[in-house]
């Protein structure tokens, strides 16, 4: 899902790169 991927990038930028590296992180979704 492209929209979900976009949210993952925003999550990564907001919290840390670690959230993006660990694709299974919750990130509020």
UniProtKB/Swiss-Prot annotation:
Q: In which tissues is it expressed?
A: Expressed by the venom gland.
Q: Name one GO biological process term.
A: arachidonate secretion
Protein family per UniProt? Belongs to the phospholipase A2 family. Group I subfamily.
GO CC, one annotated term? extracellular region
Q: What keywords were assigned to this record?
A: Calcium, Disulfide bond, Hydrolase, Lipid degradation, Lipid metabolism, Metal-binding, Secreted
Where does this polypeptide localize? Secreted
What is the annotated role of this protein in its UniProt record? PLA2 catalyzes the calcium-dependent hydrolysis of the 2-acyl groups in 3-sn-phosphoglycerides.
| Cofactor binding description | Binds 1 Ca(2+) ion.
Entry PTM: Contains seven disulfide bonds.
GO terms, molecular function = calcium ion binding; phospholipase A2 activity
- What is this protein's record name? Phospholipase A2 D6
The scientific name of the source species is Micrurus pyrrhocryptus
Q: What is its EC number?
A: 3.1.1.4
Q: Which reactions appear under catalytic activity for this entry?
A: a 1,2-diacyl-sn-glycero-3-phosphocholine + H2O = a 1-acyl-sn-glycero-3-phosphocholine + a fatty acid + H(+)
Source species, domain of life: Eukaryota
Needed cofactors, names only, are:
Ca(2+)
Entry binding sites for Ca(2+): 26, 28
